[in-house]
């Protein structure tokens, strides 16, 4: 069963982008390739339990098991040794990716306090979009009573678009609430 967003992409967005950017083939139309959710847990250096709760939160949000990220090199100022676990990340593709993107745009982002839209300047020049969230509470799956600490996360939406303009148009048509 294809998700609502995937169906909208194939039936409405692809023809619209083909006419707007004059693509000759349907394969030139940009698409969302993957979504990476990263949660850096700085306090995991001193308290290993905090990483477990972060991993649990991330698993509930993404619907799949996160990978623990480890420190690449030692930094004495942060009491950090090489190889210490300092965060977690999840890469979503396919069905889960569309489901998460749909949930993020239509349910989670509107729950952010004082939400007026997300910045349209956070593209990296190669058609990828990055957004930072300050708290995991905006996701409906996270229960307020169960969290030990408010944690933020980075969400990267990787598209096959060559330029930022194409990626912005793709995400706008998918329903990403950009600030006017």
Swiss-Prot record:
Q: State any GO BP term from the record.
A: translation
What species is given as this protein's source? Answer: Brevibacillus brevis (strain 47 / JCM 6285 / NBRC 100599)
Q: What is this protein called?
A: Large ribosomal subunit protein uL5
Q: Which GO terms describe its molecular function?
A: rRNA binding; structural constituent of ribosome; tRNA binding
Say which domain of life the source belongs to: Bacteria
Task performed by this protein: This is one of the proteins that bind and probably mediate the attachment of the 5S RNA into the large ribosomal subunit, where it forms part of the central protuberance. In the 70S ribosome it contacts protein S13 of the 30S subunit (bridge B1b), connecting the 2 subunits; this bridge is implicated in subunit movement. Contacts the P site tRNA; the 5S rRNA and some of its associated proteins might help stabilize positioning of ribosome-bound tRNAs.
* Keyword line: Ribonucleoprotein, Ribosomal protein, RNA-binding, rRNA-binding, tRNA-binding
Cellular component terms per the entry's GO annotation: ribonucleoprotein complex; ribosome
Family, per the entry?
Answer: Belongs to the universal ribosomal protein uL5 family.
Query: Subunit structure of this entry?
Result: Part of the 50S ribosomal subunit; part of the 5S rRNA/L5/L18/L25 subcomplex. Contacts the 5S rRNA and the P site tRNA. Forms a bridge to the 30S subunit in the 70S ribosome.
Q: Which InterPro entries match?
A: Ribosomal_uL5, Ribosomal_uL5_bac-type, Ribosomal_uL5_C, Ribosomal_uL5_CS, Ribosomal_uL5_dom_sf, Ribosomal_uL5_N
Query: From which residue to which does the signal peptide run?
Result: none
